Amino acid sequence: MLQHLRPTLVLGVALTLLTGLAYPLAMTGLAGILFPVEAAGSLVERDGKVVGSRLIGQSFTGDRFFHGRPSATTAPDPTDASKTMPAPYNAANSGGSNLGPTSAALADRVKADVERLRAENPGAPVPVDLVTTSGSGLDPDISPEAALFQVPRIAKARHLPEERLRDLVAAQVQGRTLGLIGEPRVNVLALNLALDELAGK
């Protein structure tokens, strides 16, 4: 009996060490050498301080900043561990809202967002990504149209010409990956950091 179990146990231990230890360590080391910024989380620094990651969205509020997509992520309610509460861009709990197209709560939330955005920029069509969440709830990017939609609000709040802000958005647009994958996009964190630099000049 032992002679039949021994090869299985040896193979199980060997594969565990190989795939659970050696392979992950090798890939982590290789990634750190070939792609040091990406392997460290694509962190963004300003004045020597980490202010975010290019890969995870942040909740920007107020009229002076570009806003990202809505986020449906949640966190445990500190007053009742059996409940959750909204926590936009919570990377520890990535996920969508599970609200389907027939959900009254989703329809009400989108309607309220559309009305708020129409009041902000009357006459302009509201870009869909400003009222819909991504599957992960962590999307760091918006469409160029969504960024341009917000220009009048930011120009008024920061006392900057709209043309300068449109040029800023155009400079931050990233094309399709490899020219084929995805859509043109703007990283909201990078755009807001560039906005702060522009406003500081």
Curated annotation (Swiss-Prot):
Subunit organization: The system is composed of three essential subunits: KdpA, KdpB and KdpC.
Protein encoded by which gene: kdpC
Record keywords, A-Z: ATP-binding, Cell inner membrane, Cell membrane, Ion transport, Membrane, Nucleotide-binding, Potassium, Potassium transport, Transmembrane, Transmembrane helix, Transport
GO cellular component labels: plasma membrane
Family according to the record: Belongs to the KdpC family.
Identification of the protein by name: Potassium-transporting ATPase KdpC subunit
Membrane topology: Single-pass membrane protein
GO molecular function, one term: ATP binding
NCBIfam families: kdpC, PRK00315.1, PRK13999.1
Domain of life: Bacteria
Pfam family of the protein (one): KdpC
Source lineage: Bacteria, Pseudomonadati, Pseudomonadota, Alphaproteobacteria, Hyphomicrobiales
Function: Part of the high-affinity ATP-driven potassium transport (or Kdp) system, which catalyzes the hydrolysis of ATP coupled with the electrogenic transport of potassium into the cytoplasm. This subunit acts as a catalytic chaperone that increases the ATP-binding affinity of the ATP-hydrolyzing subunit KdpB by the formation of a transient KdpB/KdpC/ATP ternary complex.
Organism of provenance: Methylobacterium nodulans (strain LMG 21967 / CNCM I-2342 / ORS 2060)
